[in-house]
């Protein structure tokens, strides 16, 4: 019994020794961290020799095998014990060049397309993988799993477009088709024949079914749609002249940088300054000209300024941005829309671009920047008064003679020359007896015989004899009228403003009353304005 146990133990010990000596079954100690150099090096990894355990040391050695087997095992053990050359040090990775994966994995479509266009050959690893896939057979190449699917060049470029991008392209194509159909349909609709009102405006483009006529009508309608926003608000900006208050000339003036100047500062914000002599300019010339304010400032901004600057309404017609014309990206004040004879119209502005439609009617002044000692505006009054006094048939010829010159200075120079010549003629010419001396015998004053002389004025013949010129007489008359107007404003100015305020309030109440009656009238609740006025008359 004991002999059998000893035999079993010896056989088991021999098996353990054989397993420990076998190189195929020896345990290997693997490194704890896998590095990128393991993939680059084709060398086998470094293994450490397994240490014998106490159990193995206690186990008795098995009988040695044959000599050939011993030599082979010894050679394998020597190969394992030989230490391989140390691998090259692993290069440090520049973390700044790594892609930012916080927004998702970047696409490789651009890289693949660039390689395909440049005809770049794949790297060694990719070539090996391609050969391995080719060796595996068509089944591995067509399968979508395991080897990573199809490689570059096996699918068309459209296969790399996502479904979202395909949907967007499809929607864009449909949008282009719809836009093209709308363009064709709109052109066909705009090219329809004129109605009676349109035919009167477009005599040069008759009705017809020709392709050329169709296109001309469509083009004319499209141009008319755009011009609606570029042309002035009305074809006639001013009503027909009133015979009872008609002036022979029309004077158009600007607002910004001519009558007022606005500026903004950090300390005071927006401030508005009134030019020196504005009141005198407006009140004095209102007796000679139909004054029209023609400004490029919108109504909402300019109307309160005009109401404050001219409370007594010497400006007869204010025209704002809505009355200007928009052409080539600039605002133009076109005088042809004024409903006035252009030979009797003068426009004063500070921007040559605003008056480029009729430069022959324009006087361009330098912009006023807020100088309190400025006299440029007042110095124009004698020249404008002279035009009215001489009653020129066409003011454009007069303005042409002053082209390129400072009008107040040149006019003063010409007037001085004319005055010197007039004084020479008066001194050389003997005083002749005429109707004046004949009337004096009968006790009739000369002023009564001259139709040009007004009540309280000096007779023109006597004025000429004293060396006065006709513009001097007109200036004296204009100054008397101006002083009389100033006196009336001082006496009754507040009353006029109060009456105007009451009239405005009354008009607002009437407007509100009419609006309420019309709204309630839709529902049959309140009587109309005529019924209310009739009831009030009955009560009275």
UniProtKB/Swiss-Prot annotation:
Subcellular localization, as worded in the UniProt entry: Mitochondrion inner membrane
Transit peptide: 1-38
Keywords: Membrane, Mitochondrion, Mitochondrion inner membrane, Protein transport, Transit peptide, Translocation, Transmembrane, Transmembrane helix, Transport
Mitochondrial matrix-side segments: 39-171
Annotated FCP1 homology domain residues: 244-387
Record bears the keyword Cytoplasm: no
Residue spans crossing the bilayer: 172-191
Region (Disordered): 35-164, 519-540
Regions of compositional bias (Basic and acidic residues) in chain numbering: 113-124
Annotated GO biological process: protein import into mitochondrial matrix
InterPro entries (alphabetical): FCP1_dom (IPR004274), HAD-like_sf (IPR036412), HAD_sf (IPR023214), TIM50 (IPR050365)
One GO cellular component, as annotated: TIM23 mitochondrial import inner membrane translocase complex
Primary role: Essential component of the TIM23 complex, a complex that mediates the translocation of transit peptide-containing proteins across the mitochondrial inner membrane. Required to direct preproteins in transit and direct them to the channel protein tim23, and possibly facilitates transfer of the translocating proteins from the TOM complex to the TIM23 complex.
Name of the protein described by the UniProt record: Mitochondrial import inner membrane translocase subunit tim50
Gene that encodes the chain: tim50
